[in-house]
Amino acid sequence: MADSKKSIYQQAGEWGVPFGLYLSCAAVTSIFADWFMPLQFLFLILLLGTPLVVYYFQRRRFIQDDGFTEYAGLWMLGIMLFLLGTLICSLIVFLVLQYVRPTYIVDQTQAAVDFYKTLPQMKDSEMLEAVQFAIDRKILPTPIEMVTSMFWFVTFTGSLLSALTALIAQRPLPGKRRERKQ
């Protein structure tokens, strides 16, 4: 009988879809949190839960391999999860920013400028003038530019997070001893 064990990449491909939907939920709750305040709390829970979700997938793979998955394999699984998950999330966030909330970027930037103008030390700030200039001239980043930046940021930070969770996911299985390679 042929070995039907999936490669790290196949596994990440399967698990990346639900992970992408998870990341999408977090991003969309963040986008709509200014309209419905309880979403801020939900966003915080989803954000803090991200390492646990990555750990869950890495640990699941480690257990499937009877504790013999190397650190590099678990880390690669995490990287690929973030790569695929962020790709799915980016598509959804782009659609939301482009078609559902097209003024989101301008609204949030203007809200930040208005808030900082209330602070005495920021009243005559050149930074605020520059940002207000960008708002007035309509030269703020477009949804695709924001999503592209988000994609690279989340993928990079996710790879670092995966390095950490892979270390934890490798803890020995109960009742099993790992043989050291000589």
Regions found by a protein language model. Give the residues of each.
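Individual transmembrane alpha-helix segments
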Residues: 133-156
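Functional transmembrane-helix hotspots
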Residues: 91-120
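Low-complexity, acidic polar-rich segments
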Residues: 120-138
